[in-house]
Amino acid sequence: MAGRRQGGAQHFTVQEAQNATLGQVGSMYNDGTAAMVAPTDHVFVAITFITDTTFDSSGGLIAVDSDRFVNTEAAATPLAGSSGGVQLDSSNTFPAGLTIYGRWTEIDPASGSGLIAYIGK
């Protein structure tokens, strides 16, 4: 294929690389409260909630960068001079039908737990 670098499954064309950042690497479904961990060298780039869902207060939603992406470990305030972001805890409910975007390495639902997590690079 023209434009493809040789050397293995992890080498992508520009278009394939862009698709990978949008969750086209794959997805995982969770209908319980077990933790989901992203595959090696990958992250979860979006989460769609099938049912109303909460996360464990500690370790429930682990961001690649807790300053940039909403998470349960710290209040995300990504830009200099920004404020007002709060740390997620088990009192925050994400309603069915909502999709959130970010870069997370682990998703650990506390309740509800009908969700689809989309995998990207």
Regions of interest found by a model, annotated:
Residues 46, 63, 69-76, 88-97:
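Extracellular beta-sheet-rich ligand-binding/adhesion modules
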Residues 54-76, 113-121:
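Short, surface-exposed beta-strand/strand-loop-strand elements in extracellular ectodomains
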Residues 25, 30-36, 81-106, 115-120:
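Beta-sandwich interaction modules
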Residues 1-41, 111-121:
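C-terminal interaction-tip segments
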Residues 47-49, 117:
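Generic structural hydrophobic/aromatic packing signal, biased to beta-strands
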Residues 17-19, 32-41, 52-53, 58-59, ...:
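Glycine-centered loop/turn motifs
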Residues 51, 104, 111:
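Residues on the solvent-exposed faces and adjacent turns
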Residues 45-47, 107:
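Hydrophobic beta-strand segments within beta-rich accessory/binding domains
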